[in-house]
């Protein structure tokens, strides 16, 4: 495969599909540059004194790691001055972050989870950044939270970076999924995988099995059938994988198939799940569908959900299409 840079890919996509105007290309490049900076901070680890807790909580009531706050600040500072955004929203902030008046206002909205899987930071397991781009309403004067509450099908870009043995950036602009690897010597993103595809069938699943006693019947039935192996109703053996880092689990699925599940359960019946719709489930669902997979909340396509609030949570089932369809059918016949 011819090795091309992220910038060259974006320019050629614009020529072919006319879907990446200059302002959007700038936005993608700035986010990619911020991910390089985060990768550098993550890579320093204890040497950079960035490990451990920040002794604070985010809006979700989760204890923040130092790198959560550092990564959030990197993304805010990189993106607020360029004139391509109207506002930003983050897992780490209760309200939206409008672009300061001293900078020009752009026509896009950026949402992100600055450091997904941060429970893994101190033990050197892969973590990452997830982001989603929406179009702002025409003629917007001042961004409000309601402007962000668009269905996932309205996304114009989605992607994530994984900070692991290599740093990779996985991206869709609505025409397939491409993977770029950070060349640390040159400081550039180079395309290393084109048109990633998720096989429709799989023998791997990812779920936190320690919660099994709390699962609702459709999930319990589905997992029990897989665990029964060759002598069970599925007639084949399955392997379980669970990294506790959504970006790492989804990246594996994009490369070799599988199903990722984070269902609602009986621990907190009033909560519809743990993962956030706007900046976790939606961008990952967009990527997975663009790679030929499927993504639902057990009842409907994730990208069809109309959000009601910025930090809304949803159950998530995504990955190989035939498996997602099967577990979704169990929810509909419960």
UniProtKB/Swiss-Prot annotation:
<comment type="subunit">
    <text>Homotetramer.</text>
</comment>
<dbReference type="GO" id="GO:0006000">
    <property type="term" value="P:fructose metabolic process"/>
</dbReference>
<keyword id="KW-0378">Hydrolase</keyword>
<comment type="similarity">
    <text>Belongs to the FBPase class 1 family.</text>
</comment>
<feature type="binding site">
    <location>
        <position position="208"/>
    </location>
    <ligand>
        <name>substrate</name>
    </ligand>
</feature>
<dbReference type="GO" id="GO:0005986">
    <property type="term" value="P:sucrose biosynthetic process"/>
</dbReference>
<dbReference type="InterPro" id="IPR044015">
    <property type="entry name" value="FBPase_C_dom"/>
</dbReference>
<dbReference type="Pfam" id="PF18913">
    <property type="entry name" value="FBPase_C"/>
</dbReference>
<dbReference type="GO" id="GO:0006094">
    <property type="term" value="P:gluconeogenesis"/>
</dbReference>
<feature type="binding site">
    <location>
        <position position="115"/>
    </location>
    <ligand>
        <name>Mg(2+) 1</name>
    </ligand>
</feature>
<dbReference type="Pfam" id="PF00316">
    <property type="entry name" value="FBPase"/>
</dbReference>
<feature type="binding site">
    <location>
        <position position="113"/>
    </location>
    <ligand>
        <name>Mg(2+) 2</name>
    </ligand>
</feature>
<keyword id="KW-0963">Cytoplasm</keyword>
<feature type="binding site">
    <location>
        <position position="280"/>
    </location>
    <ligand>
        <name>Mg(2+) 2</name>
    </ligand>
</feature>
<feature type="binding site">
    <location>
        <begin position="116"/>
        <end position="119"/>
    </location>
    <ligand>
        <name>substrate</name>
    </ligand>
</feature>
<feature type="binding site">
    <location>
        <position position="116"/>
    </location>
    <ligand>
        <name>Mg(2+) 2</name>
    </ligand>
</feature>
<dbReference type="InterPro" id="IPR028343">
    <property type="entry name" value="FBPtase"/>
</dbReference>
<dbReference type="GO" id="GO:0005829">
    <property type="term" value="C:cytosol"/>
</dbReference>
<dbReference type="GO" id="GO:0000287">
    <property type="term" value="F:magnesium ion binding"/>
</dbReference>
<dbReference type="GO" id="GO:0030388">
    <property type="term" value="P:fructose 1,6-bisphosphate metabolic process"/>
</dbReference>
<dbReference type="GO" id="GO:0006002">
    <property type="term" value="P:fructose 6-phosphate metabolic process"/>
</dbReference>
<comment type="pathway">
    <text>Carbohydrate biosynthesis; gluconeogenesis.</text>
</comment>
<dbReference type="InterPro" id="IPR033391">
    <property type="entry name" value="FBPase_N"/>
</dbReference>
<dbReference type="InterPro" id="IPR000146">
    <property type="entry name" value="FBPase_class-1"/>
</dbReference>
<protein>
    <recommendedName>
        <fullName>Fructose-1,6-bisphosphatase class 1</fullName>
        <ecNumber>3.1.3.11</ecNumber>
    </recommendedName>
</protein>
<feature type="binding site">
    <location>
        <position position="91"/>
    </location>
    <ligand>
        <name>Mg(2+) 1</name>
    </ligand>
</feature>
<feature type="binding site">
    <location>
        <position position="113"/>
    </location>
    <ligand>
        <name>Mg(2+) 1</name>
    </ligand>
</feature>
<dbReference type="GO" id="GO:0042132">
    <property type="term" value="F:fructose 1,6-bisphosphate 1-phosphatase activity"/>
</dbReference>
<keyword id="KW-0460">Magnesium</keyword>
<keyword id="KW-0479">Metal-binding</keyword>
<keyword id="KW-0119">Carbohydrate metabolism</keyword>
<feature type="binding site">
    <location>
        <position position="274"/>
    </location>
    <ligand>
        <name>substrate</name>
    </ligand>
</feature>
């Amino acid at each position: 495969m011819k090795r091309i840079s992220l910038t060259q890919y974006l320019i050629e996509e614009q020529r072919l599909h006319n879907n990446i105007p200059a302002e959007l290309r700038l936005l993608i490049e700035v986010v990619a540059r911020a991910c390089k900076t985060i990768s550098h901070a993550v890579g320093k680890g204890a040497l950079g004194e960035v490990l451990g807790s920040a002794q604070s909580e985010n809006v979700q009531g989760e204890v923040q790691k130092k790198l959560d706050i550092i990564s959030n600040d990197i993304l805010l500072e990189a993106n607020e001055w360029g004139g391509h955004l109207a506002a930003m929203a983050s897992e780490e902030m209760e309200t939206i972050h409008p672009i300061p008046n001293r900078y020009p206002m752009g026509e896009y909205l950026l949402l992100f989870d600055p450091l997904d899987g941060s429970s893994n930071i101190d033990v050197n397991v892969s973590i990452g950044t997830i982001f989603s781009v929406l179009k702002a309403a025409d003629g917007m004067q001042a961004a409000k939270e309601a402007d962000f509450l668009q269905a996932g099908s309205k996304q114009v870009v989605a992607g994530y970076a994984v900070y692991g043995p290599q740093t990779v950036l996985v991206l869709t602009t609505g025409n397939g999924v491409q993977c770029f690897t950070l060349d640390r010597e040159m400081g550039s993103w180079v395309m290393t995988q084109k048109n990633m595809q998720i096989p429709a069938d799989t023998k791997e699943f990812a779920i936190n099995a320690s919660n099994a006693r709390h699962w609702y019947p459709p999930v319990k039935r589905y997992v029990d059938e897989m665990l029964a192996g060759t002598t069970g109703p599925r007639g084949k053996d399955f392997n379980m994988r669970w990294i506790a880092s959504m970006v790492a689990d989804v990246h594996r699925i994009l490369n070799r198939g599988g199903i990722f599940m984070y269902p609602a359960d009986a621990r907190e019946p009033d909560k519809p799940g743990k993962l956030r719709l706007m900046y976790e489930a939606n961008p990952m669902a967009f990527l997975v569908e663009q790679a030929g997979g499927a993504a639902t909340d057990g009842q409907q396509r994730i990208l069809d959900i109309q959000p009601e609030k910025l930090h809304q949570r949803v159950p998530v089932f995504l990955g190989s299409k035939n498996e997602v369809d099967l577990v979704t059918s169990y929810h509909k016949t419960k």
